[in-house]
Design a protein with these regions (language model features):
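Non-heme Fe(II)/2-oxoglutarate
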Residues: 1-89, 110
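A short coil-to-beta-strand element that immediately follows conserved catalytic motifs
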Residues: 89-100
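A generic structural micro-feature
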Residues: 12, 92-94, 114-119
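Catalytic core of non-heme Fe(II) oxygenases with the double-stranded beta-helix
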Residues: 99-120
């Protein structure tokens, strides 16, 4: 994939937005996990994260540590670091991912305007 891992910072209407390409290996890993979850009622229930999220969608699936740890966590860490250091004079010395999930959204479902906890 072209420019994989490169972060661009854009400001199309005010606040800065980080734009990057997620490596295909990560997309495949996440998609394979989601495919596995949606085929299994017990896993669908176990990883259902919808009750904690703002969206009015069919499925919001929490990613477990075995999916996050390693390449995905490193990608998110490096992208966040590039974003923060690209906008400020601050050096990122610590990164903690609180939670990570996939929104599986279908026609006529919506995700309302909302805020996320945490600090960048």
């Amino acid at each position: 994939m072209k420019n994989e891992g490169k972060l661009d910072i854009i400001r199309p209407f005010g606040p800065a937005i980080g734009s990057t390409n997620i490596p295909k290996t990560l997309i495949d890993k996440i998609n394979n996990f989601i495919d596995e979850v949606i085929k299994d009622k017990n896993k669908s229930k176990k990883f259902d994260w919808g009750k904690y999220l703002a969206g009015q969608v069919t499925q919001e699936i929490r990613l477990p540590n075995e999916i996050i740890d390693g390449e995905l966590l490193n990608f998110l860490r490096e992208s966040t670091k590039a974003f923060v250091e690209g906008l400020t004079d601050k050096k990122v010395t610590k990164f903690q991912l609180i939670s990570c999930w996939v929104v599986r959204q279908f026609q006529n479902e919506y995700n309302p305007i909302h805020w996320h906890n945490g600090h960048i």
